Amino acid sequence: QPGTGAPTPVDVDEHCADVTATVIDAASQGLEVVRLVSGDPFLDGDIGAEAAAVARADYDVDVVPGVTGMTAVPEYAGLTLHGHDVQLIGDAACQRDIAGHGSNWSDQGLVVVNTEAGKLKEVVKHAIESGRGEDEPAALICHGATTQQTTHTVTLGELPQTAKTARLDNAEPVHIAIGKVVEAPEREQLDWYESKPLFG
């Protein structure tokens, strides 16, 4: 509903039910339906519920697993996720956590957060409250996996000002990575994407 803020779980459930009904209706007419979603479809609970409902209605369902931006964008920035304690926090979980309705984040290892540029102050506050140091290495990845991708290596406390200096719109999706791996020597060697000729 326009102007009422974030959708409630009821709104989301109703939307999911509407989409599912439309898919089943199209399938009942003998049409083939393709549902395109970004990233890995089964990381979205609504898509899983939708696919299950279509299967219960006795229609075939094929799933093509995708690659989630939560792992793809850090890899485009040369950040290796292997061999580290890694916590991945999607946008919905991030919003719950910074609003005080979720959980603390890991105070060690690598934390990767998908959020919006305008929420970085709250993200930093929550990370510090979870036990991270304000001067810990952090990376702000803007325009991830596009030819405009830029990775800023700063400290956790510098993230909000870095976004402001980069003139990011508040609603701009960003990925942040917090932890020592951001400054690992191999990261420079793994800067395979932004170092391409004619990049940007």
Tell where the protein language model's regions lie, with residue ranges.
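Short, charged, surface-exposed secondary-structure boundary motifs
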Residues: 1-3, 13, 17-22, 71-74, ...
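Class I S-adenosyl-L-methionine
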Residues: 1-64, 163, 169-174
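Short charge-dense sequence patches
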Residues: 4-6, 21-27, 71-81, 111
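Short hydrophobic/aromatic-enriched beta-strand-loop microsegments
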Residues: 5-12, 58-62, 81-88, 131-140
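A contiguous loop/helix-start segment that scaffolds small-molecule binding in enzyme catalytic cores
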Residues: 9, 22, 28-34, 46, ...
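Class I SAM-dependent methyltransferase SAM-binding "motif I" and its flanking Rossmann-like core
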Residues: 38-108, 152-153
